[in-house]
Regions:
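Catalytic nucleophile-loop/oxyanion-hole region of alpha/beta-hydrolase
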Residues: 95-103, 115-151, 308-314
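Acidic catalytic loop of the alpha/beta-hydrolase fold
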Residues: 93, 202, 271-275
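Catalytic active-site module of serine/aspartate enzymes centered on a nucleophile-bearing elbow/loop
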Residues: 311-344
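Mobile cap/lid helix-loop segments that gate and shape the active-site cleft of serine hydrolases
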Residues: 43-46, 210-256, 262, 289
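N-terminal cap/lid segment of alpha/beta-hydrolase-fold proteins
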Residues: 26-78
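Short beta-strand/loop motif that positions the catalytic acidic residue
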Residues: 260, 266-268, 272
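Primarily recognizes the serine-hydrolase "nucleophile elbow" in alpha/beta-hydrolase
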Residues: 57, 135-213
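Short beta-strand element of the alpha/beta-hydrolase
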Residues: 70, 80-91
Length: 344
């Protein structure tokens, strides 16, 4: 009994001694009070600044001037960084550039300046979205120093209709007819293209689907027809995408495969019921046949725009690919003193 008693007293004394030692150690911390939790953190990631409401282009019409907006995520590092411009999907009827924040933030944390840009949609017709996409690239090059961008390393990322747009940016490099607006002395070329369940040929979006779905894509009211021909108005009764195949092919990435292309990452879900997986397969086949650098990822079980595309495995696939192609400098943290004034 005495042995147990002595052991208990000794243990309590040791704990009190240890506690007093820790309290003495923490008393050296400015602002410390007994009972406070103390942690120590080693910085391993950079601060990311967000800028919104940037007007990258102004479209003049007979009635008004329409601004097109861009937002930016900028890692606070010293060296110029590669940039990626995200163009959102929306079936050619919307272009909400606030989407896909998980992907955009992951890219910013990997060391990229990440822009997200809206573009003109139906009832505006082709080539308006392509003109806008190229204008966004030129704007970023023009303001590269302001935003810490390396103008020689600009990639583009898009999903669905945004995937069509970035494919067009990659396949029409050197076709200056699409360069309209400001800063036309700057190149609109891009150094990497990542397309997620994008459209490569407006003439066969429903390839492999049931006959009734393929017939829908021959309607004058379907969005690809509206993109190419515009809506019915006055004497114009509207037109099917099949009514002018030359025009439709000119508005498709598959119609611009003659020149050399930047590296492509193509991703598609095998269960996509909105944009046929054949759209990505045919682009992959064509680029590979032409000897271009292209990677193709089929995501098993993925539908069009479902939650699969927001999971870490998909996001990491995209981040890793852009990292290989554009090589951001992720090893240098910003000077802590340089940011102190912003935190006051």
């Amino acid at each position: 009994m005495n042995l147990y008693h002595n052991f208990l007293i000794g243990g309590l004394a040791a704990m009190m001694t240890m506690g007093n030692a820790m309290a003495t150690e923490h008393n050296d911390l400015t602002g410390y009070r007994e009972g406070a939790k103390v942690i120590q953190v080693k910085p391993s990631r950079n601060q990311i600044d967000a800028i919104s409401g940037i007007v990258y282009s102004q479209i003049a019409t007979a009635r008004e001037t329409r601004p097109l907006h861009m937002s930016l995520l900028i890692p606070r590092t010293e060296a110029p960084k590669p940039a990626i411009i995200y163009f959102p999907g929306g079936g050619f009827t919307s272009a909400n550039h606030d989407k896909y924040i998980q992907m955009r933030m992951a890219l910013a944390e990997a060391g990229f300046v990440v822009a997200a840009a809206e573009y003109r949609i139906v009832p505006d017709t082709f080539p308006a979205p392509v003109n806008d996409g190229k204008a966004a690239v030129r704007y970023l090059r023009q303001h590269a120093e302001t935003y810490g961008v390396d103008p020689a390393r600009i990639g583009v990322l898009g999903d669905s209709a945004g995937g069509w747009l970035v494919q067009m940016l990659g396949t029409t490099q050197g076709e200056t007819a699409f360069d309209r607006g400001d800063f036309t002395d700057k190149s609109s070329d891009v150094q990497a293209v990542a397309t997620i369940y994008g459209i490569s040929d407006l003439l066969n979006i429903g390839e492999g689907y049931a006959d009734n779905i393929q017939k829908v894509h021959q309607s004058p009211a379907v969005t690809e027809a509206l993109l190419v021909h515009g809506p019915a108005f006055r004497e114009f009764a509207g037109a099917s995408i099949m009514d002018d195949t030359v025009k439709a092919r000119h508005a498709s990435p598959m119609g611009h495969l003659s020149n050399s292309k930047p590296p492509f990452l193509i991703m598609h879900g095998d269960k996509d019921s909105l944009v046929s997986p054949h759209q990505s397969a045919q682009l992959f086949d064509a680029l590979r046949k032409a000897g271009e650098k292209v990677d193709y990822v089929v995501v098993k079980g993925a539908e069009h725009g479902d939650l699969t595309w927001y999971q870490p495995e998909v996001i990491q696939e995209v981040v890793s690919w852009f990292t290989r192609e554009l090589k951001p400098d992720t090893g240098v943290l910003a000077d802590q003193s340089a940011r102190s004034n912003d935190n006051l």
